[in-house]
Amino acid sequence: VRNHLLLALLNGKEYSGINNSYAHDFLKDVNNEDFRFCSIVFLIDKYAAFIESIPSKEQWLIKYSLCNIFEEACRRFGDGYGTDLALNEGIVGIVKFHKAENILAIAQNICEELQAYMKRFDCTLSCSVGTPCDNMFSVSASYSTAISNAHYRFFLGQGSVITPEAVKTIKIKQNNTLKDMDLKWSNVIASIKSCDMDAIAKSVGSSFQCLDMDKNMISFRSAYFRMISLLNSFINDYLLYKKEALNYKLDMLFERDYETIDDACSGITDFCCELSEEFRQLKGSKTNKDIFALVNKFVLKNYTDRSLTLSKIADE
């Protein structure tokens, strides 16, 4: 009943008609003028590695323990309730705190305790704080803000405490740094053709640095799609003999759900280096064939010359 009520509140459903003593106890003081309410989302970083390395039963126990630690920490400021996220990548909680308290300080304090617990499993958490509200029945708006802002972990990195104020600052700083992205992606393609791995790392890093400065997820996805399209064209133009295998890897890059921009940069860099190595081998093979054709032509023309030697062929 408790988790059912909590998820209902977070999703904006009304439970005014429930005649249940537990529900009544859970919803008491929702209009207490001395308190405010806020939803906080905690995402487990590197979640794919988390579910691969930890048995499913232990995963449930870890999240259950996180909820208990969250609620215990909240009692120092007022009260709190936690439950599993519906998408299973962490937990979500509602903290009830005195109006005199600062929600950012509360969130950081709670996050530190949860981080200390997760260190036992070599894991970290990212925390996204919603907008505080005066009524618990309005906490769905706070939850919506927390979920929306959680996407900024992609730019701010794992282990971040993401607040509405931080996101607002990011949006103010967003600008038109993407105008020259086509030129930057062209530089990436040029570095692949140069077969210089350091140049590839530098050009890809410069491109993603520009995207990181903008911190706009919509713009990032558009630019990332453009990069994938250019790499696909490169494969079709130069590496057609390996098209199927390389396109499969490219599709995986496009569909992969990266947690941070650094992960995306690393994935693109590795793939570009692989393309460059294939291109280098192709150029080497073509050069060898051209040399063989020239040698063969020269020998056929001069095979009757008794002075013909390997040195003379090489000189020619």
Set out the residue ranges of the language-model regions:
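Cytosolic nucleotide-binding catalytic cores of signal-transduction proteins
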Residues: 69-93, 97-104, 111-136, 151-157, ...
